[in-house]
Curated annotation (Swiss-Prot):
GO BP terms: cellular response to interleukin-4; cellular response to macrophage colony-stimulating factor stimulus; cellular response to tumor necrosis factor; membrane fusion; myeloid dendritic cell differentiation; negative regulation of cell growth; osteoclast differentiation; osteoclast fusion
Membrane topology: Multi-pass membrane protein
Topology Cytoplasmic: residue spans: 1-34, 79-97, 231-292, 398-470
Membrane-spanning ranges: 35-55, 58-78, 98-118, 210-230, 293-313, 377-397
Subunit and interaction comment: Monomer. Homodimer. Isoform 1 interacts (via the C-terminus cytoplasmic tail) with OS9 isoform 1 (via the C-terminus tail); the interaction induces DCSTAMP redistribution to the endoplasmic reticulum-Golgi intermediate compartment. Isoform 1 interacts (via the C-terminus cytoplasmic tail) with OS9 isoform 2 (via the C-terminus tail). Interacts with CREB3.
Gene (name only): DCSTAMP
Record PTM: Glycosylated.
Name recorded for this polypeptide: Dendritic cell-specific transmembrane protein
Upper classification of the organism: Eukaryota, Metazoa, Chordata, Craniata, Vertebrata
Length: 470
């Protein structure tokens, strides 16, 4: 308990130094500079971890740290902005950045794999056609040549003029196959298809190398832009109206002062007001916040469906090629029989018989697809888990953004409190008389109305406890 109290006191003292404007004294200046340097170091460190390409060297990181320190020491807006950036990483800006990163992982991973499987299928088909061209033409022609030579061997040489003329005859058979024509056609077709595939694969690889950097830069830009718009609306001419639905501790104190001065007060809120306005701190979302939570998760669900669609197309192509390859492996080969028939005196006899086997698909030409599920969906699972956590914490982070902004700009916070207080009073003045009487009757049923001594005793005990603590 003592460690928790000491840690809380240290944090509150550092927070007061960071939020308060710079004091003229040297000691206060050194404390202010130290806190700003610590925040700058944490900010640059997190940026280096999240986007190592953005600060690739120690010199760049050191220069960024020095610039951040100077900005934090000199500008209250910069100190508020950098804290709001961290909180915005858990809101819609951070959600959009994570969705962009997940979309890049899915598209670049699965599309590249689809192109790889298509290329493997094309290579397998051309390889098999080339192999079948040789395995069909040459065995047939070889057997045909053997048959011709066998017939030539059966021929009876001429015996006319043997004593005058000597016969020296030979049989020369030339082999010609149109396979080179098929080879040229295959090369032309393969070249045309592969040129398109290689171009698309090269484009995919370039996008894959640059995509992570561009998406990280786009996500960081979205966070910075969203934070800048929030500060602009909060500090703008109508800033007291922007997201002014939170009942803060300062609002409660203001309402208590109004009560002590016998002026109209708004606390406690009625049932309808509790549905619309949020009492800080609270972990139970209002109906409006639950609606915003649904809107927060809607883009996540839409992009998740798109990611699953890309993965399904990739997986179906993988299963198709894999099943076809498995069927090709299980197909039996063809046995080709060559028979030479001879006719003699009206009867046909088989005078030469030979056979050879031809496989339907060459084993070394079977395509081997791949489906790298872990390389894509492991980081996607981490991104989805972070998105779910951010969605559940979005209402709390929004409350923290309002509290941080109010700490840096107390004058704006006073205007917001006065506006919200007047708005509630104006709305209640338009309520029917019966509703006012019902609220009054509820107030009359409270015990401190009839026994104000109990309220005074409780207040005295709280004052004594606060005095002992101080």
């Amino acid at each position: 308990m003592g460690i928790w109290t000491s840690g809380t006191d240290i944090f509150l003292s550092l927070w007061e130094i960071y939020v308060s404007p710079r004091s003229p004294g040297w000691m206060d200046f050194i404390q202010h500079l130290g806190v700003c340097c610590l925040v700058a170091l944490i900010s640059v460190g997190l940026l280096s971890v999240a986007a190592c390409w953005f600060l690739p060297s120690i010199i760049a990181a050191a220069a960024s740290w020095i610039i951040t320190c100077v900005l934090l020491c000199c500008s209250k807006h910069a100190r508020c902005f950098i804290l709001l950036v961290f909180l915005s990483c858990g809101l819609r800006e951070g959600r959009n950045a994570l969705i962009a990163a997940g979309t890049g992982i899915v598209i670049l991973g699965h599309v590249e794999n689809i192109f790889h499987n298509f290329k493997g299928l094309l290579d397998g088909m051309t390889c098999n056609l080339r192999a079948k061209s040789f395995s069909i033409h040459f065995p047939l022609l070889k057997k045909y040549i053997e048959a011709i030579q066998w017939i030539y061997g059966l021929a009876t040489p001429l015996s006319v003029f043997d004593d005058l003329v000597s016969w020296n005859q030979t049989l020369a058979v030339s082999l010609f196959s149109p396979s080179h024509v098929l080879e040229a056609q295959l090369n032309d077709s393969k070249g045309e298809v592969l040129s398109v595939l290689y171009q698309m694969a090269t484009t995919t690889e370039v996008l894959s190398s640059l995509g992570q950097k561009l998406l990280a830069f786009a996500g960081l830009s979205l966070v910075l832009l969203g934070t800048g718009l929030f500060m602009k609306r909060f500090l703008g001419p109508c800033g007291w109206k922007y997201e002014n639905i939170y009942i803060t501790r300062q609002f409660v104190q203001f309402d208590e002062r109004e009560r002590h001065q016998q002026r109209p007060c708004v606390l406690p809120l009625n049932k309808e007001e509790r549905r619309k306005y949020v009492i800080i701190p609270t972990f139970w979302p209002t109906p409006k916040e639950r609606k915003n939570l649904g809107l927060f998760f809607l883009p996540i669900l839409i992009h998740l469906c798109i990611w699953v669609l890309f993965a399904a197309v990739d997986y179906l192509l993988y299963r198709l090629i894999f099943s076809v390859s498995k069927q090709f492996q299980s197909l039996p080969g063809f046995e080709v029989h060559l028979k030479l028939h001879g006719e003699k005196q009206g009867t046909q006899d088989i005078i030469h018989d030979s056979s050879f086997n031809i496989s339907v698909f060459e084993p070394n030409c079977i395509p081997k697809p791949k489906f790298l599920l872990s390389e894509t969906w492991v980081p996607l699972s981490v991104i989805l888990l972070i998105l779910v956590m951010l969605g559940l914490l979005s209402s709390i982070l929004m409350q923290l953004k309002i509290l941080v902004s109010a700490s840096f700009y107390p004058s704006v916070e006073r205007k917001r409190i006065q506006y919200l207080h007047a708005k509630l009073l104006k709305k209640r003045s338009k309520q029917p008389l019966g509703e006012v009487k019902r609220r009054l009757s509820l107030y009359l049923t409270k015990i401190h109305f009839w026994l104000p001594v109990l309220k005074m005793i409780r207040k005295k005990q709280m004052d004594m406890a606060s005095a002992d603590k101080s």
